[in-house]
Each structure stands twice: as structure tokens, then as C-alpha cells.
Amino acid sequence: MSMVYINIFLAFAISFVGLLMYRSHLMSSLLCLEGMMLSLFVMLTITILSNHFTLASMIPIILLVFAACEAALGLSLLVMVSNTYGTDYVQNLNLLQC
């Protein structure tokens, strides 16, 4: 396994640990999710290009589209929560609270 793969895997792992540690604020969670998606995109692209999988060359673009949709939905949710409650705490997203 080359150093590039190790670095990208470490970026994914650090983003995942950040998602587990900083899950109280919505903005921190969204940034960690974007880091995870970016590292997955780079890893998938490098793997497909190095192995010459021509049939699977569309998969990283589809992953990037899903990441953009996730970012747009996350930011719209962040704006809605911050306008309603004044903070970006994830606990405000619980619909079972009164």
C-alpha cells in the first residue's frame, strides 16, 4: 500500500473521529462529513485510474454529485435551525422534544 493511500485513509479516519467527537454542533458535523466524502472521492478516483477500470470511471462523479446534494441539504438544514433556534446544536433537531 503506497503512502498516498495511507494519507487518504488517515484523512478519512481523522474526519470520522472528528465526526464522533464534535457532534454537538451541526456545522462541525457537516465539515467532518465533507472531509469524509472528499477523501472517499480521491481514494476512489485514484483506485479507478491506477487499475484502468474504464467502465467504473463514472462512479467518482456520481459520488461527487451525492456529496454536493448532501452539502446543500445540510446547509439548508443549518440555516433553518439557526434561524429558528439561534444556535446550531444538533440536539435542536430532535423532533420528540417539546
Swiss-Prot record:
Q: Which cellular compartments is it found in? A: Mitochondrion inner membrane
**Keywords assigned by UniProt, alphabetized:** Electron transport, Membrane, Mitochondrion, Mitochondrion inner membrane, NAD, Respiratory chain, Translocase, Transmembrane, Transmembrane helix, Transport, Ubiquinone
User: According to Swiss-Prot or TrEMBL, what is its membrane topology?
Assistant: Multi-pass membrane protein
InterPro entries from the xrefs?
NADH_UbQ_OxRdtase_chain4L/K (IPR001133), NUOK/Mnh_C1-like (IPR039428)
Reaction(s) catalysed by this chain, per the record, are:
a ubiquinone + NADH + 5 H(+)(in) = a ubiquinol + NAD(+) + 4 H(+)(out)
EC category:
translocase
**Which molecular function terms from Gene Ontology are attached?**
NADH dehydrogenase (ubiquinone) activity
**GO BP of this protein:** ATP synthesis coupled electron transport
Where are the membrane-spanning stretches? 1-21, 29-49, 61-81
Claim: Lipid biosynthesis is one of the keywords in the record: no
What EC number(s) are associated with this protein in UniProt? Answer: 7.1.1.2
Q: Which GO terms describe its cellular component?
A: mitochondrial inner membrane; respiratory chain complex I
Q: Keyword Membrane on this protein? A: yes
Gene3D superfamilies given for it? 1.10.287.3510
What does the annotation say about its assembly with partners? Answer: Core subunit of respiratory chain NADH dehydrogenase (Complex I) which is composed of 45 different subunits.
Its family remark reads: Belongs to the complex I subunit 4L family.
Q: What does this protein do?
A: Core subunit of the mitochondrial membrane respiratory chain NADH dehydrogenase (Complex I) which catalyzes electron transfer from NADH through the respiratory chain, using ubiquinone as an electron acceptor. Part of the enzyme membrane arm which is embedded in the lipid bilayer and involved in proton translocation.
Q: What is this protein called?
A: NADH-ubiquinone oxidoreductase chain 4L
Q: Which gene encodes it?
A: MT-ND4L
